[in-house]
Amino acid sequence: MDYQNQKSNENKHGEKLMMKNRSKFVGVRQRASGKWAAEIKDTSKNIRMWLGTYKTAEEAARAYDEAAFLLRGTNTRTNFSTTHSIPTNSPISLKLKNLLHRKSISNLSQSKNQCTLMSSSLQGAPIDNSIMVMENENKSSCSSEESKSLFWVQNQLVSEYNPYGVDMNMMNCSIGITPNTLQIDYSWPLPQQRINELPTLNDSVNVYGMNECYVEGTYESKYEYDVNYPLSHLFCFT
């Protein structure tokens, strides 16, 4: 019971001290030593400045009013009327100017550092060469395929697109064309209907073409190939 009464008395005494130390002025509080401290804050500018300690609460309140007027202008809340002019060379004024100057330099330095960091990161970014590599690979692949395709045409395509087994070398010799001198363009696909139109073999035909003409063995004629069409149409000139 005695312990509870003692604790209650201590709490009441602490509340009295807090009420006594609480100032009626804005930005002023009493320290444990009995002196009054003034401090100003501005959350919009992220500023907190210590104005010093004073013997009386009124002196601390006037210091706060001066700093608030210099920082926020005439629309700020003050403890006393600020109609009188405030000297620009007062200690509080000089202290506040130095604080604002250091703050602006710090902000400018941070912005420059951010710009430099962004610029260096962009300049040092690796260039994606996958597209160029892919293009080069495609070009080399196409080049090799073209070479292979040309070789294959010269060696294989003639027999594949000659379903009737016509001996092209014998035909060339019969019409006076020496081997390896005839250039045939097989780059176009052979239409299916052209294959169906090929004539059937018989004894009376000794030269074969693509539904164009045929020549009996007794006629003297000149023949030449159309190199711009698959399986080279055989044209007759009398």
Swiss-Prot record:
GO CC term (a single one): nucleus
GO biological process, one term: nodulation
PROSITE patterns, alphabetized: AP2_ERF
Tissue and organ expression note: Expressed in roots, root hairs and leaves.
GO molecular function, one term: DNA-binding transcription factor activity
Record bears the keyword Nucleus: yes
Subcellular location: Nucleus
CDD domains: AP2
Main location: nucleus
SMART domains membership: AP2
DNA-binding region positions on the chain: 24-81
UniProt KW keywords: DNA-binding, Nodulation, Nucleus, Transcription, Transcription regulation
Induction and repression of expression: Induced by Nod factors in root hairs.
Top-level taxon in the UniProt lineage: Eukaryota
Function statement: Transcription factor involved in symbiotic nodule signaling in response to rhizobial Nod factors (NFs). Binds to the GCC box (NF-responsive box) of ENOD11 promoter. May act as transcriptional repressor of NF-responsive box-containing target gene promoters in root hairs.
Identification of the protein by name: Ethylene-responsive transcription factor ERN3
